[in-house]
Amino acid sequence: MSSNQQPVVLGKLGSCHGIKGWLKITAYTDSVEGIFDYSPWLIKENGEWREIKVTQWRYQGKAVVALLDGVETREQAQMLTNCEIAILPEQMNDLPADEFYWRDLIGCEVVNTTGYNMGIVDQIVETGSNDVLLVKANAKDSFGKVERMIPFVPEQFIKTVDLQGKQILVDWDPDF
């Protein structure tokens, strides 16, 4: 299964809350509430994904807790502690042409405007001013680099993003 078909992890189930099956939620979405915009969820339990619906959620102090369909006791909830929460890729919102999901950029080849292959996007780091591509350099990098950090600033450094071809064209000196 390609990375674009893999479930998209949005968070994980935390510890139990109370005796009626409530679980604390750790959300990786921009806002904690954002994870509840998606339904149904996929829960990875014993290495297998299964569909589950949230029947209720609420703030509990500074935490967010949820009650899942079919989970009615603390014991049932304990079985789900630390399970990942995901959705299918087709559940994600469509983006404007000039915006990208990070997961789609990971694995893209990065080439500069002179044709030099800078490496592969390994991860993306969120900073205060802009996101930064962490590019794992090729084993035979001419400049002896192991990785490069390239600011994701469209037009200035990021010239084109070809998701179909899995390639990002950058205006970046390979010696940086």
From Swiss-Prot:
Domain of life: Bacteria
Cell compartment(s), UniProt: Cytoplasm
SUPFAM superfamilies documented for this protein: PRC-barrel domain, Translation proteins
Keywords linked to the UniProt accession: Chaperone, Cytoplasm, Ribosome biogenesis, rRNA processing
GO cellular component: cytoplasm; ribosome
Record's keyword annotation contains Chaperone: yes
Comment on protein domains: The PRC barrel domain binds ribosomal protein uS19.
Subunit record text: Binds ribosomal protein uS19.
UniProt-recorded name of the protein: Ribosome maturation factor RimM
Species in which this protein is naturally found: Shewanella baltica (strain OS155 / ATCC BAA-1091)
Gene coding for it: rimM
